[in-house]
């Protein structure tokens, strides 16, 4: 779909119709290699690398803010120049690095996971630090996804619900404040509430996205025959590729994609339920939530159910770092699923009972249940 959605923009910008498709293919190859390798390596071997990986990701997210190093696009500095591969976005790599680290950290502190001061406060502080870096990059969409990654791992690891409610409420107020303070975010909110009020201005992207989806009908106009991609819909090959999918393949195509993500989500959480240790439970939950939530946000944005967030559609949108990192995360998830207990649906109740017991908040001072492997 990247080839079809980007061909017009690629030719006008780079005089090559396959400029973006070629780079996406290279990143896809890198991603599939990472998927294969990580699906074969025991996921528990990632634990010793978790702290170093998180620190490296944070440093890269900090370095990208340096004017001489980072690349600025549309007023946001989030990328490094990757030469013939296009650009490299550290925050995408950070999703996987922080997912591994937070699952490791929660398992390490599982003996007092319900303690507000010993666990929740440090957890919230780590999340706040990551969000601060993302806000400096002006990346609200990735910030929302990062919250989902952290919170899902915390909940799967046995965190208290009231702590998560408090955290989400505080972050919600923070995001509202940021929206009110930034004029371009207010413009997005206004366009979301009534895109037809200014269809040639702030509501242009949302309006064209809806037109694209509507013109697809049941079966679409055919692959490669989209009209919106010819300069009408901005970011047609990136954040709004779902609208091009809807235009070219119709309701049938978009429904199949949604069902595909639903299937992935169910299988991912099933892998989390059957993971042999708390680290695997948290890691599988965070990876599944990351990809599923990102897809949900993107589709909601394209259909104007939510304001524009700038979140890509996993596996479909153009973006080499995002694609390679997501495929690598799928490799980790496959390894967790392969390591899980039970090989038939009949074991699902047993797996759920074990997961439910693991989520019970340990009494402070009790000895932590050991993981299968360190």
Predicted feature residues:
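Membrane-helix boundary/helix-loop-helix interface segments in multi-pass membrane proteins
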Residues: 1-138, 299-314, 318, 322-323, ...
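Transmembrane alpha-helix boundary/anchor motif
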Residues: 33, 41, 101, 176, ...
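Hydrophobic alpha-helical segments of membrane proteins
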Residues: 136, 140, 144, 220, ...
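Hydrophobic, glycine- and aromatic-enriched re-entrant/interface helices and adjoining loop segments
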Residues: 70-87, 163-257, 275-283
């Amino acid at each position: 779909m990247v080839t079809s959605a980007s061909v017009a923009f690629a030719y006008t910008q780079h005089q090559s119709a396959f400029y973006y498709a070629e780079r996406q293919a290279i990143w896809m190859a890198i991603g599939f290699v990472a998927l294969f390798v990580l699906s074969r390596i025991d996921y528990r071997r990632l634990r010793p690398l978790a702290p170093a990986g998180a620190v490296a990701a944070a440093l890269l997210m900090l370095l990208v803010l340096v004017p001489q190093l980072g690349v600025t696009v549309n007023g946001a500095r989030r990328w490094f120049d990757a030469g013939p591969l296009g650009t490299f976005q550290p925050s995408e790599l950070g999703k996987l690095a922080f997912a591994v680290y937070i699952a490791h950290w929660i398992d390490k502190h599982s003996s007092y996971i319900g303690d507000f001061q010993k666990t929740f406060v440090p957890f919230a502080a780590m999340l706040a630090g990551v969000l601060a870096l993302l806000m400096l990059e002006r990346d609200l969409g990735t910030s929302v996804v990062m919250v989902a990654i952290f919170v899902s791992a915390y909940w799967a690891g046995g965190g208290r619900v009231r702590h998560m409610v408090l955290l989400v409420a505080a972050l919600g107020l923070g995001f509202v404040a940021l929206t009110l303070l930034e004029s371009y975010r207010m413009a997005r909110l206004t366009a979301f509430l009534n895109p037809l009020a200014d269809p040639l201005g702030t509501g242009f992207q949302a309006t064209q996205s809806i037109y694209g989806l509507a013109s697809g009908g049941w079966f679409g106009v055919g692959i490669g025959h989209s009209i919106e991609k010819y300069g009408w819909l901005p970011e047609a090959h990136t954040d709004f590729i779902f609208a091009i999918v809807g235009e070219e393949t119709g309701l049938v195509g978009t429904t199949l994609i949604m069902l595909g993500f639903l299937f992935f989500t169910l299988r991912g959480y099933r892998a989390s339920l059957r993971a042999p240790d708390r680290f695997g439970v948290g890691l599988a939950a965070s990876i599944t939530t990351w990809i599923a939530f990102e897809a949900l946000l993107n589709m909601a944005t394209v259909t104007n159910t939510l304001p524009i967030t700038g979140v890509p559609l996993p596996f479909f949108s153009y973006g080499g770092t995002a694609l390679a990192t997501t495929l690598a995360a799928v490799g980790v998830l496959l390894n967790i699923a392969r390591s899980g207990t039970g090989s038939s649906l009949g074991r699902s109740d047993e797996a759920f009972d074990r997961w439910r017991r693991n989520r019970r908040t340990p009494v402070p001072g009790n000895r932590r249940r050991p993981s299968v492997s360190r």
